[in-house]
Each structure stands twice: as structure tokens, then as C-alpha cells.
């Protein structure tokens, strides 16, 4: 687990990164807790096909190749909740007062809920997005978890993910 990313990492990823998060330069910690999981593994092939055919285009091309390499062994199911006892904030998991939603699940859902999904029919005027601009450090969330959520809901994928590097100001 990386506390900077607020994300679980697989044993393979931890080994490949020599136990250090490449984005935060801090060691991963071993963590065990009860969570709900989103079965994104079931969508690996459909996501791969959407990216390979540019139905969900990833630009620049080297970021597309980077994510397709990440997809080679399929996606791992992802924890979608955290124990409430460990957090002083969070959206409660419906029907389970002991759990709150993992921040990336509710953050990604904002793309469609802010335009009225599922209650206001006008949301369909704005979705699918023509372009989503994201940072390089959140590509796996936007090209893996987010498409799996959309496919699970039977919704179309964004048309393009434009992945930029980090923008700094004054050396920061």
C-alpha cells in the first residue's frame, strides 16, 4: 500500500519497483484490511480492445503503449472501500456503516454524476466525453478502473485520454 497514492499495489508491482513507490519515493507498507472489491479483472479484454482500436484513444502514443504493457497480464480487482475506523472522512458504503468508499471510486464517478447521471436525462448530452486530460501518474485509474466502472454500468467510454507530464511552477 502506498499512503501517498492511497492505493494498493500488487506483489509484482512492489517487486518491480524495488519496494519504493515511483511517484512518491516512499516505501510501500504491507497492509491487511477488510474491503469490498470491484471486479475490474472481468473487463481487461474489453478495455484492451477499446485502447488497441482507439475507441478509447490514449495520447501520446507512448502512454498508450505503456498502459497496454501494464494490461498484458490483465487487470487485478481493486479495493473499492476502506474501513471507517481508519478514516475520519469518506462517503459511506450503502448498507455497511463500517466502510467508506475508496477515494478513487467516488472521484471517478464525479465525471458523470456532476452532469446528472443517473437521474437527469440531460447527462447524455455531455457523455461520453470527447477528451479527458489527465496527469501521467493517474493513467492506470483513468484507463483501467474508470473504463471498468463505465462498462459495468453499460455506459460508453470516453473518446480520448490525453496524458500529460507534471506541470511545475518555479521548480515546484
Where are these regions (language model features)?
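Structured secondary-structure scaffolds
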Residues: 4, 22-172
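Cys/His-rich Zn2+-binding cysteine-cluster or related metal-binding knuckle/ribbon modules and their
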Residues: 1-15
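Residues immediately within or flanking Cys/His clusters that coordinate Zn2+
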Residues: 18
